UniProtKB/Swiss-Prot annotation:
NCBIfam families: 4OH_2_O_val_ald, PRK08195.1. It is an enzyme of class 4 (lyase). Belongs to the 4-hydroxy-2-oxovalerate aldolase family. It comes from Streptomyces tendae. Residues 1-21 are annotated as: Disordered. Keywords: Aromatic hydrocarbons catabolism, Lyase, Manganese, Metal-binding. This is 4-hydroxy-2-oxovalerate aldolase. Its EC number is 4.1.3.39. PROSITE patterns: PYR_CT. Mn(2+) binds at D24, H204, H206. The keyword Lyase applies. InterPro entries: 2-IPM_HCS-like (IPR050073), 4OH_2_O-val_aldolase (IPR017629), Aldolase_TIM (IPR013785), DmpG_comm (IPR012425), DRE_TIM_HOA (IPR035685), PYR_CT (IPR000891). Residues 15-265 form the Pyruvate carboxyltransferase domain.
C-alpha cells in the first residue's frame, strides 16, 4: 500500500491509545517501581491526554508473588496513587483469572477504575466468562484479551474473541506476547476478529524482532481501534510498542489519536529518566525469545537460571517454545535448564545450536 493510499484508508479514523507503561513496564525492573515514579509518569501522561493509563504488577491484579516477583507497591497503593493523580486520562487495570479473583476486581472498583481488562490464554476465553459477566452487571467497561496469540490461527482467535463479546466484553484484543508476529500475521488476525465482532478491537505488540510499531500500524490499517504502547517501549524483553514513535506515525498516516505530541515526548523523557535504568534493547536473547515464541517476561528468569545451571539461555528459550509454555509456567524454566544440563553432562547434545531458522 502506498503512503497516499494508507492516508486515504485512515481518513481521520480515531485510534485510541492505551498506555500500560506502569504495568507492563514493571517486568523490566522486577516490579520495583515506587510511588514517586508512579506520580511523575502519571502526571506527564495525563498532561499529554493519553486516553487510558494502566497500572499494576506486570502480571496484573493480585499477581505479586514469589513465583513471578513481588511488587514494591501493593495493588491498593498503585491504584490509589493513579486515582489521585489522573484528571483526564482513564484508569485501567489488568487481571488474569487464576492470579486474581472477582474479589480483586471488586477491590479495584473501589478505586473507581474506569476499565478492567481480562486476559486469558489464546484458546481459553471461557475462563473469563464469570469475570466479564460480573463487570457487565456492574456497568463497568470491560475488555477481553487473549495472549500468546501466535499459537492460534486467525479463525481460532476470531472465535475466541466472539465468545468474549458474548460474555460481556465491550472490547476485545490480542497480545503478541512473545514479539513473534510480522505485519502480515497481524493483518490476518485483526482482520478476522474485526469481521467477527462489533466492538472495538485492540492490538498489543512486543518488539523482539523490531516489528512492534510496524505491527501496530498493520493492526490499525486492518481495523483495530485500540493500540497499546509504552513510553520508550518500556516492557518485558525487548520492550513494547514505543508510544512516542507510534503516535506521530499514526497521525502522519491520517489516524487521529487526540494526544498532545510535545507533552507526550515530555512524558517519554520522564519515563527514560525516572522509570528505567536503560531503555529496552533488542539483544540476542530477545531475538531468540521472539523466534521461539516465548513470553517476553521470561527473559530475566531464563538468564538467571541459565547462569546458575551453566547452560545456554538460547537453548532454554527454544525448548520452552517447543513445549509452548505460557505465562504462569515459570517453574518449567528450571526443569528445562536441568534437562539441558543433564543431557550435556551425559554427552548427549541438547541443541545443535542452529535453532529453528
Amino acid at each position: 500500500m502506498s503512503q497516499e493510499a494508507a492516508r486515504d484508508a485512515a481518513a481521520g479514523r480515531p485510534v485510541q491509545i492505551h498506555d500500560p507503561t506502569l504495568r507492563d513496564g514493571q517486568h523490566a525492573v522486577r516490579h520495583s517501581l515506587g510511588a514517586e515514579q508512579f506520580r511523575a509518569y502519571l502526571k506527564a501522561a495525563d498532561a499529554a491526554a493519553v486516553p487510558v493509563v494502566e497500572v499494576g504488577h506486570g502480571n496484573g491484579l493480585a499477581a505479586s508473588s514469589l513465583q513471578v516477583g513481588r511488587a514494591r507497591l501493593s495493588d491498593d497503593e498503585m491504584m490509589s496513587i493513579a486515582r489521585e493523580t489522573l484528571t483526564t486520562s482513564k484508569l485501567g487495570v489488568l487481571m488474569f483469572p487464576g492470579w486474581a479473583t472477582t474479589q480483586d476486581i471488586k477491590n479495584a472498583l473501589a478505586y473507581e477504575v474506569d476499565l478492567v481488562r481480562i486476559a486469558t490464554h489464546c484458546t481459553e476465553a471461557s475462563v473469563a466468562e464469570r469475570h466479564l459477566g460480573f463487570l457487565r452487571d456492574e456497568g463497568v467497561e470491560a475488555h477481553g484479551m487473549v495472549v500468546m496469540t501466535h499459537m492460534a490461527s486467525p479463525d481460532q482467535l476470531a472465535e475466541e474473541c466472539a465468545r468474549l463479546v458474548g460474555y460481556g466484553a465491550t472490547g476485545v484484543g490480542i497480545l503478541d506476547s512473545s514479539g513473534h508476529f510480522l505485519p502480515s500475521d497481524v493483518t490476518a488476525r485483526i482482520g478476522a476478529i474485526c469481521a467477527a465482532v462489533d466492538v472495538p478491537v485492540m492490538f498489543h505488540g512486543h518488539n523482539n524482532l523490531g516489528m512492534a510499531v510496524a505491527n501496530s500500524i498493520a493492526a490499525a490499517q486492518a481495523g483495530a481501534g485500540i493500540l497499546d504502547a509504552c513510553a520508550r517501549g518500556f516492557g518485558a524483553g525487548a520492550g513494547n510498542t514505543q508510544l512516542e514513535v507510534l503516535v506521530p506515525v499514526l497521525e502522519r498516516l491520517g489516524f487521529r489519536t487526540g494526544i498532545d505530541l510535545y507533552r507526550l515526548l515530555d512524558a517519554a523523557d520522564i519515563a527514560g529518566r525516572e522509570l528505567m535504568p536503560a531503555p529496552p534493547t533488542i539483544d540476542s536473547v530477545s531475538i531468540v525469545s521472539g523466534l521461539a515464541g516465548v513470553f517476553s517476561g521470561f527473559k530475566k528468569p531464563v538468564l538467571d537460571i541459565a547462569a546458575r545451571e551453566g547452560v545456554d539461555p538460547r537453548d532454554i528459550f527454544f525448548e520452552l517454545g517447543r513445549r509452548q509454555v505460557v505465562a504462569g509456567q515459570e517453574d518449567l524454566i528450571v526443569e528445562v535448564a536441568l534437562a539441558l544440563r543433564a543431557a550435556r553432562d551425559g554427552a548427549s547434545p541438547a541443541s545443535s545450536g542452529t535453532g529453528p531458522c
